[in-house]
């Protein structure tokens, strides 16, 4: 189990906000830049760093709510972790991180990396809640049983999530299915 969570300085974290609180935040941003099973191009390992960097340009005020939501919920960003090259070990690690965060009554917001991390991310939720619904936005269905010999490929990430009987799926915007995945 991950014993202690180490955080970035607030100005270096998600949104670049200056939270003075000790650890009253309800949201913990988890940068997890896994890049293992991509089949076209690369760079997913830089995703969390680039998302956090871009988030510093976001306007914090919400005109519908008439306040800055981060001030009510609080957000803290974990320091990046060393990610194992072995996909099974990487998935176990992100699962343990999320489990630790949930035990502290916080909500993990994971920034990937490739989306093969999704099954590892949801495991603690499948244990904590009777039913969960996964909302999936992607150009592909990611429902293959395996891809290029890898059961935990980015192309089978959502299929692995559906291995848990208490997970249902809403998938939006994919462009095509394969014959074996069309029954899902």
Located regions from the model:
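Metal-dependent C-N hydrolase catalytic cores
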Residues: 1-133
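General structural signal for secondary-structure boundaries
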Residues: 21-22, 166, 177
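Active-site histidine-anchored catalytic micro-motif
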Residues: 106-172
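Conserved small/polar residues in nucleotide/adenosyl-binding loops
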Residues: 175-181
